[in-house]
Design a protein with these regions (language model features):
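Generic beta-sheet signal
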Residues: 71-77, 99, 120, 143-149, 180-182
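Membrane-embedded segments
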Residues: 80-139, 143
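A transmembrane-helix-recognition feature enriched in membrane-embedded lipid enzymes
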Residues: 1-52, 110-115
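A short, well-structured juxtamembrane/interface segment
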Residues: 34-72, 135
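Soluble extracytoplasmic domains of inner/organellar membrane proteins
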Residues: 128, 134-136, 140-145, 151-167
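A cross-family acyltransferase "interaction/gating" segment
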Residues: 107-110, 124, 157-231, 238-239, ...
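Intrinsically disordered, low-complexity terminal tails and inter-domain linkers enriched
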Residues: 56-70, 257-283
Length: 284
């Protein structure tokens, strides 16, 4: 195991200890300050440089992701890797929506559970409705909630249609919907080193990242999609996907996933081939 691997293990264990011992006593804003700093350190340990663009928030709000008195904001992001979560956290700490299977991931599953991830329980008939209620409550508190709207990962060279199920609480709350584009590169060229796709094991993905050279992740906050008037969740999902595709310089998604079942909600979509021929995997 390279030195980075040892440091990463120690960092994750420290994060679990902090979240378990301290978080129950802290307000969400203070938790998020710790999450942001911890995530930035994780990226540094992994040798991943973070670059952000377009974040239109004052530093005090960007540091916590919480804006009391506001209607909150929903981030709709493309998805390449498990490390996407920490890249977004390092830029703007958010409460993520994820499939319940993430709980079983070694160490990382416990960590993301302790920091307040909202899970969708697969196999439950009313899973999406239950999650939507919790998302609505968090938005009403002025929090930032993040969703990987493709419901699965790609290698970053394509974009899949966005699910719209989890947009319902944002529209109901009157929250802003922000498209967020993530792109990995090395020496100025698009890189697939961070991609977590197909049947790849988490350990393999981790090794690829730790041994990559000059890996950079860009997190771009794009122009919010209007949610007023007669714009429904389907319209917002398509508009967000198109803005991300344009920024990534990839073709816009083909087809639609507007009527997916509960098991196709965020992080529970079935696998689909991406443009490069690799098989996407269900998302965190």
């Amino acid at each position: 195991m390279p030195l980075r691997g040892v440091l990463l293990l120690a960092h994750v264990l420290a994060g679990i200890a902090i979240a378990a011992a301290i978080f129950p006593w802290l307000a969400q804003r203070n938790r998020n300050r710790i999450i942001r700093a911890w995530s930035g350190w994780l990226l540094s340990i992994c040798g991943v440089r973070l670059r952000t663009a377009g974040l239109p928030l004052p530093p005090a709000i960007a540091a916590t992701g919480v804006e009391p008195g506001s209607r909150g904001r929903l981030l709709l992001a493309n998805h390449v890797s498990w490390i996407d979560v920490f890249a977004i956290h390092a830029a703007l700490p958010s409460r993520f929506v994820a499939k319940s299977e993430i709980r079983s991931w070694p160490l990382l599953g416990l960590l993301v559970t302790l920091v307040g991830t909202l899970y969708i329980e697969r196999g439950r008939r009313h899973a999406v409705a239950s999650t939507n209620r919790r998302v609505f409550d968090r938005l009403q508190c002025g929090e930032t909630v993040a969703v990987f709207a493709e419901g699965t990962t790609t290698d970053g060279r394509s974009l899949l249609p966005f699910h719209s199920n989890l947009l319902a609480p944002a529209l109901e709350a009157g929250a802003e919907c922000w498209p967020v584009a993530l792109r990995y590169s090395a020496d100025g060229l698009r890189s697939t080193a961070a991609a977590f796709v197909g049947e790849m094991a988490l350990a393999t993905s981790l090794w690829n990242i730790l041994t990559a050279r000059r890996l950079q992740v860009e997190v771009a906050f794009l122009e919010p999609v209007p949610t007023t008037g007669d714009r429904g969740r389907h319209h917002v999902a398509v508009a967000a996907a198109e803005r991300i595709a344009d920024w990534l310089d990839v073709p816009p998604p083909r087809g639609r996933r507007f009527n997916g079942s509960a098991n196709q909600g965020a992080g529970t979509a079935d696998s689909a081939p991406d443009a490069a021929g690799a098989t996407a995997r269900p998302a965190p």
